[in-house]
Amino acid sequence: YGRSGYAPVFRYAEETFIASGTPTADTGLTLEMSAEYTEKRYEYLDRKLRERPCCIQHTEEDFQVIIADLQLGQGFVCTLSNGEEITALAITYPIGKANWRIGEIVSDTPATKTLLLQHICQSLNLPSIRVLTPPATGESQLLGMARIINAKTMLQLYATAHPELE
């Protein structure tokens, strides 16, 4: 990949969410675990990813490929909803025989993120689950590569966005 112009650039941190032994309170939010595509799920994920300062943006076609991969690997898109509105979403897949990982998680609030993780652990009967997140500080791992195809245009865009830099 390096000879083709790719460079490892996408860093993630891995955290372990430990489920509380206490059952989740009735919040009126509903957990749904499915490996089926819906436009509503894609639109929510897309909207929440666009709120991040830097991330991999997935097209609708990319999301459909992710769904197909989840179907093959017995994974799920897990959503927490209050009626018709999604409040949190996680892409969840098994790793090994008894472990699961959240490859992506987005939510309206930190509380709904925690509640979604708690519901997932209860539903899958897990004491804990691994969660990949954008790194805040500290240790991270490289999980993706990128290649700039049109360097001149990229540099012009960067210069426009950051005029204070020389």
Predicted regions and their residues:
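Short, glycine/charge-rich beta-strand/loop segments that flank catalytic centers
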Residues: 1-2, 17
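Structural alpha-beta junctions
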Residues: 122-128, 148
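Conserved beta-strand-loop-alpha-helix junction that forms the acyl-donor binding cleft
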Residues: 2, 131-139
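Conserved acetyl-CoA-binding loop of GNAT-fold acetyltransferases
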Residues: 4-11, 140-154
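Amide-forming acyltransferase catalytic core, primarily the GNAT-like/NAT-type
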Residues: 7-111, 118-122, 134-135, 151, ...
